[in-house]
Amino acid sequence: MLFAIGQRWISESENSLGLGIITGQDNRTVTISFPASDETRIYALASAPLTRVLFQKGDEITHQLGWKARVVDVMMRNELAFYLVQRLDNNEEIVVQEMELAHQISFSKPQDRLFSTQIDRNEHFVLRYKALKHQQEQFQSSLRGLRGNRAGLIPHQLHIAQEVGRRIAPRVLLADEVGLGKTIEAGMILQQQLLAEKVQRVLILVPETLQHQWLVEMLRRFNLHFSLFDEERCADFDNPEDHVEANPFVAENLIICALDWLVQQPKRAKQALAGEFDLLIVDEAHHLTWSEDSPSIAYELVMQLSAVIPAVLLLTATPEQLGQQSHFARLHLLDPNRFYSYRAFEKEQQQYQPVAKAVQSLLSEHILTVEEQNHLAELLSEQDIEPMLKVINSQADTEQKQVARGELMSNLIDRHGTGRLLFRNTRQGVQGFPHRIYHQIKLDLPTQYQNAINVLNMLGEIKDPELFYPEQIFQKMNADATWWRFDPRVDWLINLVKSLREEKILVICQDAITAIQLEQALREKEGIRSAVFHENMSIIERDRASAYFAQQEEGAQVLLSSSIGSEGRNFQFACHLVLFHLPNNPDLLEQCIGRLDRIGQRRDIQIYVPCFADTPQIRLAQWYHEGLNAFEETCPMGAILHEKCGAKLTEFLTSDTTDDFQAFIQQTHQQQLQLKSELEQGRDRLLELNSNGGEQAQQLANDIAIQDGSTELIDFTLNLFDIIGVEQEDLGEKSIVISPTGTMLVPDFPGLKEEGVTVTFDRDLALAREDLEFLTWDHPIVRNGIDLIVSGDIGKSAVALLVNKQLPTGTLLLELVYIIESQSPRGLQLTRFLPPTPLRLLLDIKGNDLSHQISFQGLQKQLKPMGKNMATKVIKIMRPAIEQLIKQSAKNVVEPAKMIIEQAKQLADQSLSAEINRLYALQAVNKNIRPEEIEQLESQRTLSLELLNQANWRLDSLRVIVSNKE
């Protein structure tokens, strides 16, 4: 390819970008600007997916100023085209440089391919039409961005994702209780925003220990490839010799890094602030300490980032756990103008308390007192609620009262103090969780361990934490010793595994080496099939271990994991958990149990803790169980109590005496009960209703389940693979291996690895086996497959034989598919209202459109393929008639195309105006409606209608049909 600045090219893979201009090139790359969509692309010279745009004599062009002209002659100078044209409005002849051509232009000439005998197979034309129809449907689907995640269909998660994901620059606090899936909610919101092109650049800040968990979750659940940033990676961008420091944060669009690292590296923090991100996600945001006088450095950094990044998601503990002051600090990060003073916030919250009590009465279906009705009238106008209150307090039937209560609750939710900013679900509110059953196994400490402890104690070589791991102390004496040959925990574990032959068992150890040694013990002693899973393994190796464990037949019965290695992995298909070592704080304990105790777990969880008598292990287990009840219930107050009692607990764990330990446990238990009671009293039922979505959320889950059960995606995708030339191998168990081949119609299938990939269309199987790709309409392989067809030349022109005894032999029909589309900047989401829409015409020899009488499928059933030689002869003979029909189709398409564009404008106006009016109404009673949100929507409405006015249409594909008697 010869490139020159000023040349006009189009992208083969992204037709919607419009007509591009070469703006720069070097030895390896070429830069091209697409003014129509306000985009710039940089391609490798050797493989740029670009097509040179050169018009020929007789072609019609459009100037940037809007006038049209016909090309009279073409001249080339220095690789640039100069067109002598005749304007269509005044017949003036003028020379136009190619740089002056209109940017909003469509290029696709199936007739050129047809007349040059580049004829596609009939099935390719059918695939193209189906791909266009599916593309249109998916752009307009309300389930887009919600159905493609490797996650169960949990109503409250889907509700939050839909509610927040459709907003412009959402700024919210996700504060669900542990185990309810805040990470999944954040991922679903992120995916919706990315698919809608509302955001492109994303920064996720997490604690250092959770970086890989987020990396795995984003990749495995959402097919999002994030980059992990640390000092080593960023140092590669520092080049003192150039005297110019490149900003590493602009090198990638999707970035995960540790918040602590940014705090410790002011230079990197400054670079992140200059990174021009669209969305910021902060996990464990409750660790950002704040007070009015001295906010922490971490808090101030997040404050600075949230000031320059439009969309912000904070994942945090529940407000009740945080306390009001800390809760205010998170809200201040999201909207400092609204939450400017803690005292004002406190006063507002106190005013809301009576309303919360009235809500409780409504939920309990009690008759509201006069005082409660007055409190509700303070939040809603009396005239708004009076009709509803009359029904609620009357002798109306139960159904009428239920409707009135529902309407009143809906109004209250919209006007709730922090309803649009805060989402918080509790296990009690969501329900559907299994029980957790604790089994303590008390064993005698082997003399080998006791002797090793005594000797190393005398030498002063034991640190307190090591007392929890006697096998490691023993190995200090003799590194080659096989401790598992005499450790009674190993024999107990083997007996447990043998007694649960049909069950899967997850065993969590503190470290990788113990997991590896236990695998050896199970294999050598009893030949038990097991897999190991730890932080020293690559993601692919962990996937394989996870898949081996998930297999029902011939799979591993036991998975032996280190505590860090299992982060981010959920094994809901198992219900037996062995804690070979106990974590040293309640949050880590909950993380371990959370591998099995997730929403969607269908069976009670059996938790086994083998401990040695009279050791720190058993005392810690006792404190967890009797003090916190942390094994059998989630313990949201665990971290608070551990911080409060930690020093005293450590004393009891490391001393030989256990005097007063029982009293200490009892004291912890009393504090736990008190905190639990306070949390329950502080529950905001109205907020919970807003957060879980009620019946609408359930309907959303049902809609996705119905689509999951449809075979439409499977039929289309397998047909797509067949035609493209992707190899398919059915493995049974609802999974297939797809691999690229050397005979594919395209040189590369985006998203399909060279070594192939195993895929499934079944959600339950995808949840059980993380090594499988879960194919949905939102999956990159499916989306890329559709793009390959609709943006390429496959199926653009075809010839077919119509077998019909009623028609004279040689009767000509021409089937044409036009695309109605609008070119617009990312983020405007015009595809909601006007996606690339196929409009089918079926013309007879007289130019009559028969498409309304004869459907695509109905016609297809009567068609037979025509050989290439015969098709070439038919085209040659019938070319004049075909050319005449193509001209006629350009007239036929005008009215229906204009109607579709008008409908899109009406839909855009109605949809955006309704949302603007709703926000204006809410703003009058709810201060959390940000003025800039309404302003953005109004600008969006104006620009959307303007660009829809400029929508146009183009001929995408055509099929010549000739009749025969047989």
Swiss-Prot record:
Residues 489-643 form the Helicase C-terminal domain. A motif (DEAH box) lies at residues 283-286. Its EC number is 3.6.4.-. GO terms for molecular function: ATP binding; DNA binding; helicase activity; hydrolase activity, acting on acid anhydrides. One of its GO terms (biological process) is regulation of DNA-templated transcription. Residues 163-337 form the Helicase ATP-binding domain. ATP binds at residues 176-183. Keywords: Activator, ATP-binding, DNA-binding, Helicase, Hydrolase, Nucleotide-binding, Transcription, Transcription regulation. Signal peptide: none annotated. Interacts with the RNAP. Has a higher affinity for the core RNAP than for the holoenzyme. Its ATPase activity is stimulated by binding to RNAP. PANTHER family: DNA ANNEALING HELICASE AND ENDONUCLEASE ZRANB3 FAMILY MEMBER, SWI_SNF-RELATED MATRIX-ASSOCIATED ACTIN-DEPENDENT REGULATOR OF CHROMATIN SUBFAMILY A-LIKE PROTEIN 1. Transcription regulator that activates transcription by stimulating RNA polymerase (RNAP) recycling in case of stress conditions such as supercoiled DNA or high salt concentrations. Probably acts by releasing the RNAP, when it is trapped or immobilized on tightly supercoiled DNA. Does not activate transcription on linear DNA. Probably not involved in DNA repair. NCBIfam families: PRK04914.1. This is RNA polymerase-associated protein RapA. The gene is rapA.
